[in-house]
Amino acid sequence: MRINHNIAALNTLNRLSSNNSASQKNMEKLSSGLRINRAGDDAAGLAISEKMRGQIRGLEMASKNSQDGISLIQTAEGALTETHAILQRVRELVVQAGNTGTQDKATDLQSIQDEISALTDEIDGISNRTEFNGKKLLDGTYKVDTATPANQKNLVFQIGANATQQISVNIEDMGADALGIKEADGSIAALHSVNDLDVTKFADNAADTADIGFDAQLKVVDEAINQVSSQRAKLGAVQNRLEHTINNLSASGENLTAAESRIRDVDMAKEMSEFTKNNILSQASQAMLAQANQQPQNVLQLLR
């Protein structure tokens, strides 16, 4: 029996230190709720988890971007709803003015024309005033530019967490000039061109086919209505796409969060079981260390 080195006590002390260290790690994981609190806990798992976290946050921001895109489209579409209503009223007035058999050109047609002029001015007003976060939406800033594609401006929405996951939207000029109601210089053009509506020029001849006649001007209004309808349909399609995009982003984010949780989050029941085991082993080690420290004293029995 040796008394200078208590090997049993040293071995027991090592076990006690190991059990205490394991218990501390168990408590850290239980208190944080995370299985990986530092790279040393699981280096590969930490790297994968951080990549997933980046993707999750990217998906969340992409969903917000899509929501903002829907808000922009709703702003533009709401303005075009009013433009549609104005054009329907203009068409109604043109049809009314076409009843030249009962209209007086000097008074009745001029009154109708005054209202038409006011309405077309408001179409321009809507086009110039409709904005979203400082961006004018309906004045042609973001229209398709086939003449100079290099100068094309698009409304770009980042709808994914990674590069090249964007959609571009164009909105045509919805001003009165572009809708075929009037030209910038106010001139009367050919039937296929943009026209100024001027019902005071309607002739009494029902067979009139001139560019300033009833048929020509009514066709201009109908074309304007069709242009607005087409633009609203395109915006509606983009809005529907963005709504589906949001649903997909939500599902992807949910699945990725669940996967990241399985890597990084702690299994509370399992970890509590491990903590209980290590705590019991620590207490047992303390008791055995006390016993090991008593062994050298037994040498005194040999000296009696």
From Swiss-Prot:
| One GO CC term, this protein | extracellular region
Main subcellular location of this protein, as a coarse class: secreted
| Pfam families in the cross-refs | Flagellin_C, Flagellin_N
Q: Which domain of life is it from?
A: Bacteria
Q: Where in the cell is it found?
A: Secreted; Bacterial flagellum; Secreted, Cell wall
Keywords from the UniProt entry: Bacterial flagellum, Cell wall, Secreted
Q: Which GO terms describe its molecular function?
A: structural molecule activity
Swiss-Prot/TrEMBL induction comment = Under positive control of SigD. Repressed by CsrA; repression is greater in the 1A96 than 168 genetic background and higher in minimal than rich medium.
Q: Which family does it belong to?
A: Belongs to the bacterial flagellin family.
Q: What is the recorded function of this protein according to its Swiss-Prot or TrEMBL entry? A: Flagellin is the subunit which polymerizes to form the filaments of bacterial flagella. Assembly into flagella requires FliW. Acts as a homeostatic autoinhibitory regulator to control its own cytoplasmic levels. Partner switching by flagellin between FliW and CsrA provides a flagellar assembly checkpoint to tightly control the timing of flagellin synthesis. Flagellin binds to assembly factor FliW, freeing translation regulator CsrA to repress translation of the flagellin mRNA.
Q: How does it assemble?
A: Interacts with FliW in a 1:1 complex. Forms a 3-way complex of Hag, FliS and FliW, in which Flis and FliW do not directly interact.
- Specify the protein name: Flagellin
